[in-house]
Amino acid sequence: MARNWKFDPQEQIDYTIEWIKKYFVKKAGPDTKAIIGISGGKDSTIAAALLVRALGAERVHGVLMPCGNQADIAHSYEICNALGIQFDEINIEPVVDVFYGCVGHGDCEIPAVRTNVPARMRMVTLYAIAAIYGGRVVNTGNWSEGWIGYTTKYGDLAGDFHLFQDLTVREVLMMGRIMEEIPRHLVDKAPADGMTGQTDEDNMGVTYEQIDAFLLEDILPDVNTWRNMSQRHERNEHKKCINLPGPFAHGRHYEKGKHGGVFEVF
């Protein structure tokens, strides 16, 4: 990785906006909408703001997908209103419950099922909305999540294009903090899965800053944390079968094993 390279959030914002514009010219059409799941978290919030800057609010359509009662859904309303985008709210809990009943196994109670089925149902919902409105689904995950595998295959890993696959949590935050249209508390809120009541970092047993320090600076945490990180990374290698086009971070050079994405240059 280039040791003298410094991430410039404004440069990345400008580049990402241009990438979005070119993607929709070449891969879609003048009326095609961007369809984005709005969770109220930093990634979907910042991605939505970038899409609005690139395409205009009229071509960005949000989808709110609580599973039952979502305690922080007010944050999803807040960002949609702040950006002036239209949105649908679809509670996926009834469909998820029917699915569990159809499967008919007590094993539906295990955490892997309870975590991954709603994530996949959300992606099914996004593609249904995309078909209705004529749109492309944006993936809002980041490199830090992807590297450690804190994602769901065919759930939040899916989409038509991927805005942050080359950016760590640290870098996405740097971008969001200089975008004045975004309420700051939505940028800085702790990432959470919305189901267990815990943050992502609680669930993983590692902080995003520790992941980013390794990815960007080759700084290793303590032995136990590194063992946890590396084991999670290795166990989740199978998720890398899904590669989407997306912008890259300028000037970055990669070491084998750290990254695997598809960066499309127009």
Give the positions of each predicted feature.
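Short, well-ordered alpha-helices that flank and scaffold nucleotide-derived cofactor binding pockets
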Residues: A49-R53
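Short, surface-exposed alpha-helical segments at coil->helix boundaries
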Residues: S44-A48, I73-Y77
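ATP/NTP-dependent adenylation/nucleotidyl-transfer catalytic domains that generate, transfer
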Residues: M1-I36, E58-H61, G68-N69, I79-P94, ...
